[in-house]
Amino acid sequence: MSNEAPEVEPHSKRRKKEASPSSSSGFLQSLPEAVAMICLARVSRLDHAALSLVSKSCRSMVLSPELYQTRSLIGYAEKFLYVCFCMPTDETLCCHEKINGNRSLNVLFLDCRSHKWHHVTSMRVARVSPEVSVVDGKINVWGGCKYKHYYDWGEVFDPKTQTWADMSIPKPVREEKIYVVDSWDVGSYYYLPSKSIWEKGNQDSKRSKDWCLIDKLIYSCGNDGGIYWCEAGELDWCDAVGIDWREVFGLEFLSKELRESRVVYFGGKMVKVWESYKIMYNISLNLEELLPETQLTNLTELGHNVLVFWEKLECCCDGFKILEIWCAEISLERWEGGEILGRCDWCHPILAINLLTVDPLFYHSMVLYSIPVDV
């Protein structure tokens, strides 16, 4: 008979056994379904993938629409930013271009809960790179088409009925305006849903590279890399008055990054070629002004903050080039004197692309769309 004391397992191993998936699953299964759903709803969405591996019942609850409804009802929905990048391959140089030479009627819908793409009802008019906005829960799409009639220029999608209609709204909803900035005509237009009419706004929109609206102020990125703002109502002013663009202070470091992002692809060779064309054909535009669609810079509204995207071309020690996509979150504070101060709350690269087999001059990345979603 042995007098040795029984071997005791280390504390860490006991903790692992106590927190095993089977015991966690059994605990949830012992609760009423509604209570278990509330417990899961309080868990961050970043942990849902791990939770779905615990058991079949946990996976079923994590994937159920009721979980996201519960998260919203009890105030635990989290805000995530979804960004659609143009990442051209050798076969597709730019996804803003036409598909096989044609505009497309197809529309894809991303379910932010399951991260799956679905086809929805096709548009009435084939388009490429249209502008999109949401008003009163309906998706307004306009531009990017060859149209014979004015009503072909824009159309509205109703997610509830899954149908498209022209942009003329028969009954007034509320006095909201949809602003459109034409980068070629260097001017603004706005659409009144309540009256189903278009009006010409101020044509002095020269600082327009990207736009977003926050707290009734319009923010835009200038060609010099600065971020500027104006009152929303100024887009309605007559041309003689002009738009009073004011710079957001405190973002000097960001201005340098955005300014360099404009010419990151051009290099000395391309600039020299273009300079010879300018002399030959008496052209006054610079190369970066001629190719605005190659720029990644994008402004996105995130609550009361603004997100800025830009690109950096880094050279590695082995001679290879890496394209980094950067993002910064800027908080905005309006002072008593009316000026606006910007502070960088967060700034990091979010994507790196190895340009081993791609000429950086012809690799044009851009942010197509970006939107914050509560999930």
From Swiss-Prot:
UniProt-listed CDD domains: F-box_AtAFR-like (cd22152)
Keyword Nucleus: no
Region described as Disordered: 1-27
Keywords in alphabetical order: Kelch repeat
Membrane-spanning intervals of the chain: none
Kelch repeat extents: 138-183
Matching SUPFAM superfamilies: Kelch motif
Origin superkingdom: Eukaryota
Domain F-box: 25-71
Pfam families xrefs: F-box (PF00646), Kelch_FKB95 (PF25210)
Protein known as: Putative F-box/kelch-repeat protein At3g24610
Organismal lineage: Eukaryota, Viridiplantae, Streptophyta, Embryophyta, Tracheophyta
